[in-house]
Amino acid sequence: MYQPPEASCWTGRVDSVSDERAFRLHQRIRLLDLSGPLTPLEQAAAFIGFVCDEGVRRNQGRQGAKEAPAAVKAALARLPWHLPSGASIYDAGDIVCADGRLEQSQAELGKAIARLLQSGVAPVVIGGGHETAYGHYLGVRAALGPNARLGIINIDAHFDLRPYDNGPTSGTMFRQILDEDKQVGYCCLGIQRLGNTAALFADAERYGCEYILEEQLTAGAIEAAYERIEQFASRHDSVILTICMDAISAAAAPGVSAPSPFGLSPSLARALIRRIVSHPKTISVDLCEVNPLVDEGGKTVALAAAFCMEALLHFRRLQPRR
C-alpha cells in the first residue's frame, strides 16, 4: 500500500530562513507524490520508505524495522544541508506492508523505484527489514530492462542466501534474485564467519558470489577493497548498493535485528559507502535492518541517517553536469 509523503515528519531547528548556508534538510526537502504523474528531473534523489518487517518475522528475527523509515527520516530532517547547488531531494512517501503481504509489498516497492529511475531520480530506499532489497532489485530491473548486467553490492554480515522453499524472508532475497536473473552479479562486503554456516559459504561459492570478510576489511586494507569494488563494477552496466546495518559493530549499531559483537566500524563503512555511491555506475541505494524499538539512545537511527546523507553527498548524479 502506498502512503504519500507528509510534511509533518520534516521538522527541526531553524538557524535562518534566508541564509541557505544555515539550512538543514527539513528546509530543503520537497514532497513527491507517486500517485500522480512524474516529470523528468535532473540532479534529483528521493527517499522512499519500506514500512515492513514481515521478512524479519518469517526469519525469526527481532521485529521493529517497520518503524525505521519514520525514525530515520526524522533524524535526516535535522542534518545540515551540504549538497551542491542545483541538487533536489524529495520524500516520495512509503510503501506499507499490511497484513503480512510481503510479496505484494515488494512488488509495489519495485514499481515505485522503477518510476523514480525512469524520471531521472536516484532512489534512496529506507527499510524495513532486508527483504527491502528484493523490492529494490525488482524496480531497478524493470527500469533497466532484462538484458542489462546488474551488479549488487551488499554491505552485510550475512550472505542472505537461505533457501526459500517455505516462502521469502529477510534472509532469502539474494538467492531469489540469483535464481531468477542470470544477468546479476553479487558482491558482499563485511561477511562474518560466525554469522553464516559452512553451508551458506558453500552456497556463496556455488552462486559465484564475491565477498570480503569483515576481519579482512581494515583501514590498512581499504585500498585493496576499493580495487575489488572497481573490478566488480567494471563487469556490470549498473550497480546498486544495499546496506544492512547489522554489518556494523553492535557497539555503534545496537538497534538491529541481529546485532554482532564484531562488525565494521562506522568510519570504515562510511568509506565504503562513499566509494561505491560515487561510482558512475551506481544508480540507487537501500539501507535496512534498523530497529528503533531496541535501539540505545537513538544511536543506530542517527548512524543510519548519516549513512543516507553520505549517499546523497557522494551520488555522482547529484553533482552538476560538466
Swiss-Prot record:
Binds 2 manganese ions per subunit. GO terms for biological process: L-histidine catabolic process to glutamate and formamide; L-histidine catabolic process to glutamate and formate; putrescine biosynthetic process from arginine, via agmatine. It holds the Pfam family Arginase. It is an enzyme of class 3 (hydrolase). Mn(2+) 2 binds at residues 156, 158, 244, 246. Its EC number is 3.5.3.8. NCBIfam families: hutG. HAMAP family: Formimidoylglutam. This is Formimidoylglutamase. The lineage of its organism: Bacteria, Bacillati, Bacillota, Bacilli, Bacillales.
